[in-house]
Regions:
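Short, locally clustered residues in the helix-turn-helix/winged-helix DNA-binding domain
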Residues: 15, 43-47, 108
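C-terminal regulatory/oligomerization modules of transcriptional regulators
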Residues: 1-3, 124-144
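Charged, amphipathic alpha-helical coiled-coil/dimerization segments
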Residues: 72-132
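Short, hydrophobic-biased segments on the C-terminal half of alpha helices
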Residues: 53, 71-72
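N-terminal helix-turn-helix DNA-binding core of bacterial DNA-binding proteins
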Residues: 21-66
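N-terminal positioning helix adjacent to the helix-turn-helix/winged-helix DNA-binding module
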Residues: 3, 7, 37-38, 99, ...
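N-terminal leader segment of winged-helix/HTH proteins
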Residues: 1-32
Length: 144
């Protein structure tokens, strides 16, 4: 038991507390209808709008069975829409709505606030090294 390290536990704590703080910051802007996991979907679509569900699942690391009800909810509250693919009518592409595009600036601002909070007291070199370590951990987990 003495050889166990606390990395996984610490990552989970950072994730949980970070989500709570992020949601609290969004609430200051009256954004209460979107949770942090849904924010991950929106962030992916802000980077590349019109993704098929399979690709969206991949970039968000969410299973299709988890993603589908989240997309249903975001569509229901008017933040995205599903559109038939012109090349394959069986495939649905996910697009942001105009209503959602207005949120992007707020999310960006809150994300910058979170970045400042996360990396307070770190040098650029330390941040780069830390993120490299996280990428390696993520890669290890994806191999499993």
């Amino acid at each position: 038991m003495q050889n166990l390290k606390a990395g996984g536990y610490l990552i989970a704590q950072v994730h949980q507390l970070g989500q709570r703080i992020f949601a609290k910051k969004l609430k200051k802007y009256q954004i209460v209808d979107i949770n942090p996991a849904q924010g991950r979907i929106l962030f992916a679509l802000w980077k590349k709008d019109g993704l098929p569900i399979v690709e969206l699942a991949k970039v968000t690391s969410l299973s299709k069975s988890t993603l589908t009800p989240m997309l249903d909810r975001l569509e229901e509250i008017g933040h995205l829409k599903r559109v038939d693919s012109k090349g394959d009518r069986r495939k649905k592409l996910i697009y942001l709505t105009e209503k959602n595009k207005q949120l992007q600036d707020i999310y960006y601002k809150v994300s910058l606030e979170m970045k400042e909070l996360y990396y307070s007291g770190f040098t650029e070199k330390e941040i780069d090294q830390f993120e490299d370590y996280l990428k390696r951990i993520l890669s290890n987990l994806k191999e499993e």
